[in-house]
């Protein structure tokens, strides 16, 4: 059993079986999964109470890979020194961890002697981070998606042969997706009425999954069966293209509805994270008397960096539609994070509960 992180609600105990764990480990180790082999030295940069403790460690043991555990310190310096000491070539974690690592390496003009590949999940990885790791340090960044209820792995973004012929810019667009479902997992997107939506890369709907390691019940039956006609509702909003590559557009609880149009908080955050002065950013919706909701962006600046509200809002011009640009920038000392490193937007909303939009 593993408890959910409680990022969007109360933690629930997810029940696993020996069979589901073995099947998940086998599928995760496949070439179109996490590509785990005995040649790897793997560092999962997550606490052992995290669901990844049910994933990579078992795939590593199954294939004979070296498994390196992080210590209590999750800062960039500690992670870098551990990677170098143990010759880690494959690591996995959430974007906040890799941002700290990247900042440490950049600030100290360091290089990676062994790291070849990192898998990023938990939340969307900013394009600027993928580009920096790949272009500057030669480290492949692989997007993956999953959740505690999926043991956790559901999709991995491994490029197909035809993608290797694309330009770097076009390849980045593919790498930004969460990828194709691994062997054993089925997925689909549906509209509000539960009708299947097409895999055209345009239609956007609620993401549902099923498979032999997908949760069918919670500890003590909390909340009843989570399944709907055999499918697990993930709480994510996504698109799926013709090649089966899925892209999370937002959590259903985080998407912002403004004037009848949906605004992806992830897209707004990714643009802010591309600014050289921004260390971390979180987008939330604020009630608006006319438009229902409007986005604002909470920003934590990099150490010794300086940027104004006006400069950040100007940074969005040409990168987002005018109606998608945040109405305001709120500078914060820190953005609330959970024990697994994921942003806790519920706490951020609580901190900003008395905030009022300009000109309202």
Where are these predicted regions, by residue range?
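AMP-binding/adenylate-forming catalytic core of the ANL superfamily
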Residues: 91, 211, 216-217, 237-324, ...
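Conserved beta-loop-beta connector loops within the AMP-binding
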Residues: 181-208, 242-243, 305-309, 344
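Conserved ANL (AMP-binding/adenylate-forming) active-site segment centered on the GW(Y/F)…HTG consensus within
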Residues: 138, 168-175, 195, 200-202, ...
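Conserved S/T- and glycine-rich ATP-binding loop of Class I adenylate-forming
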Residues: 4-7, 15, 42, 48, ...
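Gly/Ser/Thr-rich phosphate-binding loop
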Residues: 62, 85-93, 102-173, 186, ...
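Conserved AMP-binding A3 loop
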Residues: 1-23
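Conserved AMP-binding
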Residues: 45-50, 123
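Conserved AMP-binding/adenylation subdomain of ANL enzymes
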Residues: 22-41, 49-89, 104, 155, ...
């Amino acid at each position: 059993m593993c408890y959910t992180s409680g990022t969007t609600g109360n933690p629930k105990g997810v029940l696993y079986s020996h069979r589901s764990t073995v099947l998940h480990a086998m599928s995760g180790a496949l070439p179109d999964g996490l590509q785990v082999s005995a040649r790897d030295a793997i560092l999962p940069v997550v606490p052992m109470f995290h669901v990844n403790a049910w994933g990579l460690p078992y795939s590593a043991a199954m294939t004979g890979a070296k498994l390196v555990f992080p210590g209590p310190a999750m800062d960039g310096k500690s992670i870098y020194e551990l990677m170098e000491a143990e010759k880690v070539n494959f690591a996995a974690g959430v974007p906040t961890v890799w941002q700290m690592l990247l900042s440490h390496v950049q600030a100290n003009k360091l290089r990676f002697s062994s790291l070849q590949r990192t898998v990023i999940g938990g939340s969307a990885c900013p394009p600027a981070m993928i580009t920096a790791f790949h272009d500057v340090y030669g480290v492949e960044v692989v997007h993956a998606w999953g959740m505690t209820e999926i043991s956790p792995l559901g999709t991995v973004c491994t490029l197909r042969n035809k993608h290797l012929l694309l330009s770097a810019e076009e390849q980045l667009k593919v790498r930004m997706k969460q990828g194709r479902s691994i062997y054993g997992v089925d997925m689909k997107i549906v509209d509000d009425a539960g009708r299947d939506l097409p895999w055209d890369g345009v239609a956007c709907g609620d993401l549902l999954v099923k498979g032999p390691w997908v949760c069918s019940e919670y500890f003590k039956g909390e909340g009843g069966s989570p399944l709907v006609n055999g499918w697990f509702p993930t709480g994510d909003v996504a698109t799926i293209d013709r090649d089966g590559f899925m892209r999370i557009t937002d959590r259903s609880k985080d998407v912002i509805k403004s004037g009848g149009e949906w605004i992806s908080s992830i897209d707004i955050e990714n643009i802010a994270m591309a600014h050289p002065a921004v260390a971390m950013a979180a987008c939330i919706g604020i009630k608006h008397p006319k438009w229902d909701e409007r986005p604002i962006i909470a920003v934590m600046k990099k150490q010794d960096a300086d940027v104004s509200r006006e400069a950040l809002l100007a940074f969005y011009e040409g990168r987002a539609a005018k109606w998608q640009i945040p109405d305001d920038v709120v500078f914060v000392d820190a953005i609330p994070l959970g024990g697994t490193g994921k942003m806790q937007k519920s706490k951020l909303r609580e901190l900003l509960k008395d905030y009022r939009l300009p000109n309202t």
